[in-house]
């Protein structure tokens, strides 16, 4: 809810926004958003959409890759089309997608949960890709899955009883049970900034915008989008 005003400021007041009444993990959230598009915005069930997290640090090519995912979903060769990020090291933080081939677009053989570094090296040797939680589908597909797995009639009904829905991820509820699933490789820059540590590691400078640190500060980062400067004094390990 705290992001609604910022989204309207950036994209305009006419942008449709559906806000979760409470947290219920990614499957109910995606089902709610899908029902909003179909039942409220009256988007055709045959339309393809892309779901992506908001916190990765990416290059412009990433957004072209999102378009490619949607176009691949339009072909109806698979019910789900995932983005597989080319691994740059054997990470223990991400799940892995094991494809059937090293083609740019390939069928998915299986998924693997977050492994140890040694096991991750084995996955990468098999051509595995990071699962960044980015995928495309036709609206009707997820609407059917939502009605199959949850008891609701339409968007408003789902919204009203949302707090009673089981907490479950989209991967567990849908992706890992789907046989018609493809992955599209992405080799561009992609870094998950889901924590303050990873955000500050990606910053080339400790201050973005107008700000000053005195000599008593250590481990302090300032991100200031306002014209009013920020002065930090005697702070340690803080993001402002």
Predicted regions and their residues:
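Conserved N-terminal catalytic core of the sugar/cofactor nucleotidyltransferase
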Residues: 1-51, 57-64
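Short, well-ordered coil/turn elements that cap or connect secondary structure elements
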Residues: 11-13, 44, 75, 103, ...
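Conserved core of the sugar-phosphate nucleotidyltransferase
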Residues: 59-162, 182
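A short acidic, often aromatic-flanked loop/helix-cap motif at beta-alpha or helix-coil junctions
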Residues: 23-28, 88-91, 117-118, 190-192
């Amino acid at each position: 809810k705290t992001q609604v005003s910022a989204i309207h400021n950036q994209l305009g007041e006419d942008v449709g926004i559906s806000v979760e009444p409470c947290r219920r993990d990614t499957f109910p959230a995606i089902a709610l958003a899908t029902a909003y598009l179909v039942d409220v915005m009256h988007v055709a069930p045959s339309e393809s959409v892309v779901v992506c997290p908001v916190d990765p640090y990416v290059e412009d090519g990433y957004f072209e890759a999102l378009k490619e995912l949607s176009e691949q979903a339009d072909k109806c060769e698979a019910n789900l089309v995932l983005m597989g990020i080319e691994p740059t090291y054997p990470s223990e933080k991400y799940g892995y997608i094991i494809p059937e081939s090293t083609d740019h677009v390939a069928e998915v053989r299986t998924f693997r949960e977050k492994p140890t570094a040694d096991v991750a090296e084995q996955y990468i040797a098999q051509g595995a890709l990071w699962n960044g939680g980015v995928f495309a589908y036709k609206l009707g597909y997820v609407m059917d899955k939502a009605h199959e797995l949850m008891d609701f009639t339409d968007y408003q009904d789902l919204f009203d009883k949302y707090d009673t829905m089981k907490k479950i991820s989209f991967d567990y509820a849908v992706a890992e049970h789907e046989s018609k699933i493809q992955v599209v490789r992405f080799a561009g820059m992609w870094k998950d900034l889901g924590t303050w540590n990873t955000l500050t590691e990606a910053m080339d400078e400790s201050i973005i915008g107008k700000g000053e640190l005195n000599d008593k500060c250590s481990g302090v980062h300032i991100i200031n989008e306002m014209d009013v400067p920020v002065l930090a004094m005697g702070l340690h390990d803080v993001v402002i």
